[in-house]
């Protein structure tokens, strides 16, 4: 079966099949090797890419900018403070304007409906840099990182996600594992599982790929024998402090600490995090939480002990954001 990623949107990974995902992963590997060896060939000369950020970012913005520059493309960073988006101009009109000036558009923001609307009206490829529901560019980086740190084929890799699984990370890790035939475990309170219809959709993908999907409220069952443990922050700066109590109390059993990671029974288990991480109280939010919950001063979703240990590969994971995003740009705009 042939496929063509030229001028394709990247909105959720739902519409990408396993062969296309593997191609992007292989291309990212090749582009990474070329960058390291100094043999990279620019394929995006004179291409222009708009980067819309309604949510702040470090890794996503830097990854898109460096990936584009490496390949000879130009980027324009657009945020709400420096544009009319949402103030005097709708996303539909913004899409129709930018689509006439740019070769592609990246969007990082809130509802999935917004990036879908952008894609519908822009007339050029649109890339989802993160929405409340999905984080597809992070998933490519995560799977690339797991491949690099395992001698197993993808079908045999086992990984768990612990924490609030209703968010973009929980949804997306379940989805990409289902697409690629992997062994995926979700460990979370049942009230924080992905939506039932989304789980059913992933189970249908798993039936085609041979993936094994497990959702459990027992964190130790979730991580038994896994090769990788993923987590994400439990609270966000936009949430009121009063809302933290219920979330933290519900998720405390799912904290990634030495006891939990050793319970895997696998001395090679690695820890992964999309970042930023509240593994200590050196940040504004971390300090606020530590003051309110003194027992979490050494880490919230993950302890500082685990985060600073050799098991943690979060920074390799962060670097791979750039290589996988570059693969998306090259395959979409580079004509290969």
UniProtKB/Swiss-Prot annotation:
Annotated keywords: Arginine metabolism, Cytoplasm, Transferase
Keyword Mitochondrion: no
A matching Pfam family: OTCace
Coiled-coil blocks: none
Protein location: Cytoplasm
Pathway info: Amino-acid degradation; L-arginine degradation via ADI pathway; carbamoyl phosphate from L-arginine: step 2/2
Domain of life: Bacteria
EC class (word): transferase
Chief location of this protein within or outside the cell: cytoplasm
Entries under SUPFAM superfamilies matching the protein: Aspartate/ornithine carbamoyltransferase
GO annotation terms (biological process): arginine biosynthetic process via ornithine; arginine catabolic process to ornithine; citrulline biosynthetic process; L-arginine biosynthetic process
Substrates-to-products reaction catalysed: carbamoyl phosphate + L-ornithine = L-citrulline + phosphate + H(+)
A single Gene Ontology CC term: cytoplasm
Disulphide bridges: none
Binding sites annotated in the UniProt record for carbamoyl phosphate: 57-60, 84, 108, 135-138, 274-275, 321
GO MF term list: amino acid binding; ornithine carbamoyltransferase activity
Binding annotation for L-ornithine: 168, 232, 236-237
Enzyme Commission numbers on file: 2.1.3.3
Family affiliation: Belongs to the aspartate/ornithine carbamoyltransferase superfamily. OTCase family.
General function of this protein: Reversibly catalyzes the transfer of the carbamoyl group from carbamoyl phosphate (CP) to the N(epsilon) atom of ornithine (ORN) to produce L-citrulline.
Name listed for the protein in its UniProt record: Ornithine carbamoyltransferase, catabolic
Organism: Burkholderia mallei (strain ATCC 23344)
Classification lineage: Bacteria, Pseudomonadati, Pseudomonadota, Betaproteobacteria, Burkholderiales
Gene: arcB
């Amino acid at each position: 079966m042939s496929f063509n990623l030229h001028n394709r949107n990247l909105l959720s990974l739902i519409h990408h099949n396993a062969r296309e995902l593997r191609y992007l992963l292989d291309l990212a590997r090749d582009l990474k090797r070329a960058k390291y060896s100094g043999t990279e060939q620019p394929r995006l000369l004179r291409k222009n890419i708009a980067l819309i950020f309604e949510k702040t970012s470090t890794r996503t913005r830097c990854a898109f900018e460096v990936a584009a520059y490496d390949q000879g493309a130009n980027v324009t960073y657009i945020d709400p403070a420096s544009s009319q988006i949402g103030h005097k101009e709708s996303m539909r009109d913004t899409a129709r304007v930018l689509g006439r000036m740019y070769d592609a558009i990246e969007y990082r923001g809130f509802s999935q409906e917004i990036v879908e609307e952008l894609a519908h009206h822009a007339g050029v490829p649109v890339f989802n840099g993160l929405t409340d529901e999905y984080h597809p560019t992070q998933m490519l980086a995560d799977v690339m990182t797991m491949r690099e740190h395992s001698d197993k084929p993808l079908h045999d890799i086992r990984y768990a996600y612990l924490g609030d699984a209703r968010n973009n990370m929980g949804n997306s890790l379940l989805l990409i594992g289902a697409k690629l035939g992997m062994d995926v475990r979700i460990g979370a309170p049942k009230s924080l599982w992905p939506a039932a219809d989304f789980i059913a959709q992933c189970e249908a993908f798993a039936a085609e790929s041979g993936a094994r999907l497990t959702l459990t409220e027992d964190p130790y069952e979730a991580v038994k024998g896994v090769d990788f443990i993923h987590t994400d922050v439990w609270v966000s700066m936009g949430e009121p402090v009063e809302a933290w109590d219920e979330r933290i109390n519900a998720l405390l059993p799912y904290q990634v600490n030495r006891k939990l990671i050793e319970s895997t029974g696998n001395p090679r288990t690695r820890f992964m995090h999309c970042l930023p991480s509240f593994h200590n109280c050196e940040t504004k939010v971390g300090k606020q939480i530590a003051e309110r919950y003194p027992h979490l001063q050494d880490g919230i979703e993950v302890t500082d002990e685990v985060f600073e240990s050799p098991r943690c590969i979060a920074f390799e994971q962060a670097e791979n954001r750039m290589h996988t995003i570059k693969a998306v740009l090259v395959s979409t705009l580079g004509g290969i």
